[in-house]
Structure formats: C-alpha cells, structure tokens
C-alpha cells in the first residue's frame, strides 16, 4: 500500500467503517515506523505516524470514530468506555484499533490498558467532540 512516498507493509490491524472507509495500522516498509492511515473508497488517503498511545479519525458520515495507537509497556488489551458503554479493541504486534459508534456527538470516557492478568496498566481520558460543520 502506498501513502504518498511511503510504501506501507500489509496492515497489522484494519477496520472498515463509515460507508467503506478502511482504517489501518501498518509499518513503513523501509523505516519500520508505524502509521495510522484511513483509505476512502475513492482511494484518497490521510494519516499520521502511530507513535502515541491514542489517536483517531472519522470520515463522512461520521457514524464511527476509529481510535488506535501503540500499547503502553506491559499492556495486552485495550477497552474504551464512553458514556457507560464499553468497546474492546483489536490488539496485535503492540498496537490497538477499535471502532466506536459516534454519530458526530459529544462523548466522554476513558481508555483502559490492561496486562495479561487483566490488571490496569494505564488509563487515559478519552473524549469525542462534535466535528465542526462547514459554513453555509
């Protein structure tokens, strides 16, 4: 998969959401740096280096927010809790990815990173805010 001048390896993790947009975490074939990339059905792409514990993206119609990132040291599983609802993440090769129903509305919660025994390694606030609307 090519992203600009980058050549990305086969995705480590991938999710489809928002009417066919593909969200992936993949490594740069040359530098091995991880990238979080969204690929629209028309082939247009956007992304950033996946070098933080949490990041995310959504595309029109903003039904689902895709969050992902690197696992903190010692973490083996991830769960996002928003407004009392829990969403377990896919985890592989030190990274995580999860689809969260959003509907372009404000949601507040936390990301929990747990070790193999289910003990909390780290918790971070996780808030989703209404996307800005274009002027009329």
Regions found by a protein language model. Name each.
Residues 1-136:
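Intrinsically disordered, low-complexity prosegments and terminal tails associated
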């Amino acid at each position: 998969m090519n992203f600009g001048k980058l050549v990305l390896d086969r995705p480590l993790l991938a999710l489809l959401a928002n009417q066919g947009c593909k969200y992936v975490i993949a490594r740069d074939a040359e530098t091995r740096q991880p990238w979080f990339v969204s690929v629209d059905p028309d082939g247009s792409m956007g992304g950033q280096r996946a070098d933080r514990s949490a990041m995310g993206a959504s595309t029109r119609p903003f039904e689902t927010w895709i969050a992902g990132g690197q696992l903190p040291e010692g973490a083996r599983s991830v769960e996002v809790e928003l407004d009392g609802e829990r969403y377990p993440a896919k985890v592989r090769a030190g990274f995580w990815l999860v689809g969260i129903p959003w509907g372009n509305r404000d949601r507040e919660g936390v990301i929990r990173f747990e070790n193999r025994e289910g003990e909390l390694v780290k918790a971070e606030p996780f808030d989703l805010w209404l996307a800005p609307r274009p002027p009329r």
